[in-house]
Amino acid sequence: MDDVGHGRTLLSGHSSLNCVARLMAVALDVAETREPLSPDRAWWLRVPAVLLGPRSVFFALREDDPDDVAARSEPLLLIVWMAGAAAVLATPTAGALLDKPEYDAPLVAVWAFVAGGLYGAVGYLLFGFALFFGTRLLGSLGDFRRERQVVGFALTPLALSLLVLFPVRLALYGADTFRDGGPDEGTGEAALLALQLGFVVWSLALLAIGVRVVHGWTWLRTSAAVAAGIALLAAILGVFLLI
């Protein structure tokens, strides 16, 4: 009986997520019916929607209208910057900033803002190029812009981790978050790292969904394209490490 109840709970949770995604899609359709949404507003609404109903968001990337394409730039800028900040704040470098006498809390914030932007921009272009290579290898006729935008919206879970995990880390460890050693090492830190990796896996799943939807491919072809892109990225990083 316990197994049956547990199964029903899982099914109920899955159904709830599906209902939320459908309600968001219906709300967007109703809003468009009552009053046509501007491209800018529509793409801002798609930022949270990609977490629950990614297929409709990635399908919208097929649109080549100049106004629609331009409307994606600001949401993508925010996503890429937040994802970059989440990435740099999880590095060992960030974990030892306050060990340096020249750093204080305001300077750490400035460092996270600047380094996050640079890290995000480089990663966005590099991952976008790798995906462009992978999809071209599998016969895509799409351009670099569309591939990097697929990457950008796939980074939304990683950007979300900045709002979810980093405040938890600060609440648990305070300034020790930016010091080497101390209470921010051990089981708690391992749990936070596992959660961070969970957000990374979520982003990879969205990337695969995005490639499949944008190109209309099978899962096998999609997986091959993503794998080819990751292989190229690994090769590029390997060359940099050897230099």
Regions found by a protein language model. Give the residues of each.
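Juxtamembrane "helix exit" motif at the C-terminal ends of alpha-helical transmembrane segments
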Residues: 84-99, 237-240
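Alpha-helix boundary/capping motif
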Residues: 1-7
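N-terminal juxtamembrane cytosolic/stromal segments of multi-pass membrane proteins
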Residues: 20-86, 90
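Membrane-interface interhelical loops and short amphipathic "cap" helices
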Residues: 94-112, 174-185
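Hydrophobic alpha-helical transmembrane segments of multi-pass membrane proteins
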Residues: 41-44, 114-122, 191-201
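Hydrophobic alpha-helical transmembrane segments and adjacent short intramembrane/lumenal linkers
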Residues: 131-133, 140-243
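Membrane-helix interface/capping segments
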Residues: 96-100, 127-141
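Alpha-helical transmembrane spans of integral membrane proteins, capturing the lipid-embedded, hydrophobic core
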Residues: 76, 80-84, 88, 116-125, ...
